[in-house]
Amino acid sequence: HPGKLVRAMIDTLPKNVQLFENAPLINWKKNNDIILCTFKNTTIKTKKIIFATNGFLKSLKIKSNYNFPITLTASMTRSLTDEEFKSIGEPKEWGVLPVRPMGATIRMTKDRRILIRNTAEVYNPFQMSQLDLNKRKLNQKKGIKKRFPQLPDDIIDSSWSGIVSRTRNSSQIFEKIDKNIFAAGCYNGSGIGVGTLFGEQ
């Protein structure tokens, strides 16, 4: 589950890393050799920075003509009961991935949850109302029920949306854009694996 992954990453941050939650970067500028980052309630001054904002690089006016954000929405069921799990054949953990980068994906997790993502759209996730999210959740429930009609209607436990960054030629960004300023992003749906790989090199 993405939430568990993020919490685990936060819990293992090194002591020299500070985390600021609910603090989106509003603006940034460079004066001489000082980079000034403006947040909602504070500012940070630094001499070096890596903008690792992936799909939000464009909103920071970084590589604006190179990448574009796409909103994906996913849903995950609660853990299936013994009876429900038996009704679908008691499968081992599995996943079906799309041939195309933005195609649908569905997975069965070790703890008997079904995860489905079958929406990819140009939509601002910060403006997605609960009503809009519920519409996408209904679409995903239909997808699960089409394959597993024996499962109950209240099977979905959580739904969420997020941003991936796409480029026309499916290449990533990890480069120096100015003195002491670097940008990382455009993983084209490859996510944490590719991001980590670029960060380590």
Where does each model-flagged region fall?
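Secondary-structure boundary/capping motif
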Residues: H1, K29, R166, G191-G195
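Mid-domain beta-loop-alpha active-site segment that forms a flexible
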Residues: H1-I10, P101, R136-G143, F198
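Helical element adjacent to the flavin cofactor pocket in flavoenzyme catalytic cores
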Residues: H1-K48
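Hydrophobic/aromatic beta-strand patches that form the interior of the parallel beta-sheet core
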Residues: F20, I50, F182-A184
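Active-site substrate-recognition segment that forms the wall
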Residues: N27, T43-I44, K48-E83, S87-S159, ...
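Short, hydrophobic/aromatic-rich segments at coil-to-beta transitions
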Residues: D33-L36, P91-K92, N180
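A conserved FAD-binding loop/helix module that cradles the flavin
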Residues: F126-L133, F182-Q201
